[in-house]
């Protein structure tokens, strides 16, 4: 398990854009993390005030950060950054609302030099909320 202090060491993100609360499982190429979604998230002020829904793009950002924690926690990547280079085959299946716990899984499926491809998914209560293929570049 990786707690928030280690996540903050790995990622440059800070409030209000840090979207990973805790890592539950980690291996060489796969990670499972959570984001506890609360009504206090700043994006709910405008998306949407009468019916708060987590923006899909922020779910994908949370997945990208999850993959970033895995990559940047490795000793060989100390001091480096992970740059989000693209996403493909993104699907949104379930709305994420205040009170939900987003369980995020990212699995690295391809690496070539400083480029990595990740299959990622986010679930709420065991149901798929979003999924997609993310591409990253690792650099200084």
UniProtKB/Swiss-Prot annotation:
Signal peptide location in the record? none
Q: Which domain of life is it from?
A: Bacteria
Q: Where in the cell is it found?
A: Cytoplasm
Q: Which Pfam families match?
A: FabA
Q: Which residues form a coiled coil?
A: none
Q: Under which EC number(s) is this enzyme classified?
A: 4.2.1.59
Enzyme class, broadest EC rank: lyase
- State the function annotated in the UniProt record: Involved in unsaturated fatty acids biosynthesis. Catalyzes the dehydration of short chain beta-hydroxyacyl-ACPs and long chain saturated and unsaturated beta-hydroxyacyl-ACPs.
Q: What is the protein's name according to its record?
A: 3-hydroxyacyl-[acyl-carrier-protein] dehydratase FabZ
Q: Which organism is it from?
A: Streptococcus mutans serotype c (strain ATCC 700610 / UA159)
Upper lineage is: Bacteria, Bacillati, Bacillota, Bacilli, Lactobacillales
Q: Which gene encodes it?
A: fabZ
């Amino acid at each position: 398990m990786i707690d928030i202090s280690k996540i903050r060491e790995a990622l440059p993100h800070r409030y209000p854009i840090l979207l990973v609360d805790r890592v539950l499982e980690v291996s060489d190429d796969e990670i499972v993390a959570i984001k506890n979604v609360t009504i206090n998230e700043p994006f709910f002020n405008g998306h949407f005030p009468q019916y708060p829904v987590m923006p899909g793009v922020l779910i994908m950002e949370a997945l990208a950060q999850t993959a970033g924690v895995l990559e940047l926690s490795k000793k060989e990547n100390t001091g480096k950054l992970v740059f989000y280079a693209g996403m493909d085959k993104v699907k949104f299946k379930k709305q994420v609302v205040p009170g939900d716990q987003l369980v995020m899984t990212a699995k690295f499926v391809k690496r070539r030099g400083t480029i990595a491809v990740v299959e990622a998914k986010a679930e709420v209560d065991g149901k798929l909320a979003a999924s997609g293929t993310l591409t990253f570049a690792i650099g200084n």
